[in-house]
Regions:
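Membrane-embedded transmembrane alpha-helical bundles that form the catalytic cores
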Residues: 1-201
Length: 201
């Protein structure tokens, strides 16, 4: 379960309750050995299609946009407003292509082997609010942060100030999960502020 290779790099984050029943189906009773994996034609076709979209997002979009983003973010001083806005939009495309591409590759590879991993991105840039965005963006991470960090911290069951602190803490750590750099720390904190304002209004 821990070493299931398709989703080790960037998710989706799979919980034991979702994955172990699928694994048990593939283990022979008595011997405990893994059954011979039979690749079904329908799973193969769909899996390859999902992986192809993942590679397209990652290698064609994310990897080709990355130099533009790096160039703008490495030295934003002196750049005009349009260039900075272009950098922000390009970064949004890059991060989506990167993470959703990786998870599509993982979902497709797992499906070929006969395992179903949960959908991880659901058109996040069509979200109508910050809360809706986090129901669509890196869904397995969002639900993990909610269940194992936000709710244990008290969620929204305590004072308003405590709720806002919980949101900021979770989003700060969520930003760090996406990448250990100041860009992602700021990204996470900004999302925490957006969620707090959305709850406030």
């Amino acid at each position: 379960f821990v070493a299931f290779f398709p989703q080790l790099v960037a998710g989706p984050i799979v919980r034991a309750s979702e994955f172990l029943p699928q694994l048990r189906e593939k283990i022979e009773m008595g011997s405990g050995n893994l059954k011979q994996i039979i690749i079904h034609n329908s799973n193969l076709k769909l899996g390859i299609t999902i992986m192809a979209f993942g590679f397209l997002k990652k290698m064609f979009f994310a990897d080709n946009i990355a130099p533009l983003v790096d160039n703008i973010f490495s030295n934003p001083i002196g750049m005009d407003s349009f260039t900075i806005i272009l950098g922000a939009v390009a970064f949004g495309i890059q991060i989506y292509g990167d993470f959703s591409g990786y998870t599509d590759i993982a979902i497709g590879a797992a499906l070929i082997l006969g395992f179903k991993l949960p959908m991880n991105f659901n058109k996040p840039y069509f979200a109508t609010s910050p809360s809706d965005f986090w129901r669509r963006w890196h869904i397995s991470l969002s639900t993990w942060l909610r269940d194992y960090l936000y709710i244990p911290l008290g969620g929204n069951k305590k004072s308003k100030n405590r709720t806002y602190l919980n949101l900021m803490t979770v989003m700060f750590l969520g930003g760090l999960w996406h990448g250990a750099s100041w860009n992602f720390v700021i990204w996470g904190v900004l999302h925490g502020i957006y969620l707090a304002i959305h709850k406030l209004v």
